[in-house]
Amino acid sequence: MAPLTARSTSSPRGAVSGIRDDVPERLVRPTKYLWIEHAERNAICNAARAGTATEGCTIYVEIMPCMDCARAVVQAGITQVVIAAERMAEYSSEYYNEHFGMVEVLFREAKVAIRRV
């Protein structure tokens, strides 16, 4: 799946394809989350559009996926998530620890392997 993420969107901000990514009010939290798509779901959607099966695939990400992306990973049949351990160290807070902990439970129950590199 990694090659598909490179062509997922022309916007470095994750704007949905065809949507302007230069509107200031769309770049500020929390509103920006209504206008963007995370890399994980972008990769899954692009695989679907290209007719590429994701069943049994591995997805490579910088940090633990959010719960929305994690559910998409499971539903897409992806069986392994590879995470950049060094980058994850930057996301240590009560909020992230709790959120990513729930994602780990979801992956464990769905039998999606997590590998930190």
Identify the role of each PLM range.
Residues M1-V117:
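Zinc-dependent deaminase catalytic domain
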